[in-house]
From Swiss-Prot:
Component of box C/D small nucleolar ribonucleoprotein (snoRNP) particles. It comes from the Eukaryota. S-adenosyl-L-methionine-dependent methyltransferase that has the ability to methylate both RNAs and proteins. Involved in pre-rRNA processing. Utilizes the methyl donor S-adenosyl-L-methionine to catalyze the site-specific 2'-hydroxyl methylation of ribose moieties in pre-ribosomal RNA. Site specificity is provided by a guide RNA that base pairs with the substrate. Methylation occurs at a characteristic distance from the sequence involved in base pairing with the guide RNA. Pfam families: Fibrillarin (PF01269). This is rRNA 2'-O-methyltransferase fibrillarin. It comes from Neurospora crassa (strain ATCC 24698 / 74-OR23-1A / CBS 708.71 / DSM 1257 / FGSC 987). GO terms for cellular component: box C/D methylation guide snoRNP complex; nucleolus; small-subunit processome. NCBIfam families: PRK04266.1-2. The modification Asymmetric dimethylarginine is found at residues 5, 8, 12, 16, 23, 26, 30, 34, 41, 47, 49, 53, 57, 62, 64, 68. S-adenosyl-L-methionine binds at residues 174-175, 193-194, 218-219, 238-241.
């Protein structure tokens, strides 16, 4: 998908775990930038020092909104078709150079982090009726672990319209805003962030997305916010702490429904920078098993994040015995 981060020339290849490409000279094609699949800042066209920038800021004719990390991209003048993804509440925008993930904008006309927005006209089902428009927000996998996991092939994300989600490690709310789009006005996102600086941005975002409940607290102390949360359908965890498995476990005991889902992003270097990432991932999965989580799948977040894994689990706090 089209979120490459290229540069000034030379085929840099998969800078962060990408797929090939030599370094090249100053005027080369600058390949898979930060681990994308080809095309740098200006798309696939070779640039040279004085050459055209290509799709850098708006597609082939350099319109105003190009794909610098997927923020304001798209091919100028091309019709975009938006189709449902297999995960409910997630969509795929087709028609540009590459397919892009998207969510329905819960607050039409506003972006959260400078992401591109696409408006699609919906024909009226009644003859002679007025058509309506739906606005979508492009979801950048370089800015969201959940988007990276979906592109990596997650079988299930456990959340859909109407779901209640506990999001641990909400930061300034970039990913949270897309989760809020997915669950929609009938769902809720309880977003926990310890940093007061990021918490301010999170609160500002939540003033417009009223299904987001910002909680500026330490996720290690869930009793501090127990009165704010009901039982939730899924926990998404991106806390990047050495004891993150324990943090998830104590929150699950208080808030996660029996049979609920867990998606946890594991950053190997935050847990043990001396051990191989695969060994760290295996150790964390074992800790999750001890807390009654049953792993369903594990996948890497390359090329969007280096030495990260996403683990999907089902929570079974009670032991079931077959008669």
């Amino acid at each position: 998908m089209g979120f490459e981060r290229g540069g000034r020339g030379g085929a840099r290849g998969g800078g962060r775990g990408g797929f090939g490409g030599d370094r090249g000279g100053r005027g080369g094609a600058r390949g898979g930038s930060r681990g994308g699949f080809g095309g740098g800042r200006g798309g696939g066209a070779p640039r040279g020092r004085g050459g055209p920038r290509g799709g850098g800021r708006g597609g082939a004719t350099r319109g105003r909104g190009g794909a610098r990390g997927g923020a304001k991209g798209g091919a100028a003048g091309k019709k975009v078709i938006v189709e449902p993804h297999r995960h409910k509440g997630v969509f795929v925008a087709r028609g540009g150079k590459e397919d892009l993930l998207a969510t329905v904008n819960l607050v039409p006309g506003e972006s959260v982090y400078g992401e591109k927005r696409i408006s699609v006209e919906n024909a009226s089902k009644e003859e002679g009726g007025a058509s309506t428009k739906t606005e979508y927000r492009i979801w950048n996998p370089f800015r969201s672990k959940l988007a990276a996991g979906i592109l990596g092939g997650l079988e299930t994300i456990y959340m859909k319209p109407g779901s209640k989600v506990l999001y641990l490690g909400a930061a300034s709310g970039t990913s949270v805003s897309h989760v809020a789009d997915i669950v929609g006005p009938t769902g809720s996102v309880y977003a926990v962030e310890f940093s007061h600086r990021s918490g301010r941005d999170l609160i500002n975002m939540a003033t417009r997305r009223t299904n987001v409940i910002p909680i500026v607290e330490d996720a290690r102390k869930p009793m501090a916010y127990r009165m704010l949360l009901p039982m939730v359908d899924v926990i998404f965890a991106d806390v990047a702490q050495p004891d993150q498995a324990r943090i998830v476990g104590i929150n699950a005991k208080l808030f996660l429904k029996q049979g609920g889902g867990l998606l946890i992003s594991i950053k190997a270097s935050c847990i043990d920078s001396t051990a191989p990432p695969e060994q760290v991932f295996a150790s964390e999965v074992q800790k999750l098993r001890e807390d009654k989580f049953f792993p369903k799948e594990q996948l890497t977040l390359e090329p969007y994040e280096r030495d990260h894994a996403m683990v999907s689990c089902v929570y079974q706090q009670k032991e079931f015995v077959d008669n």
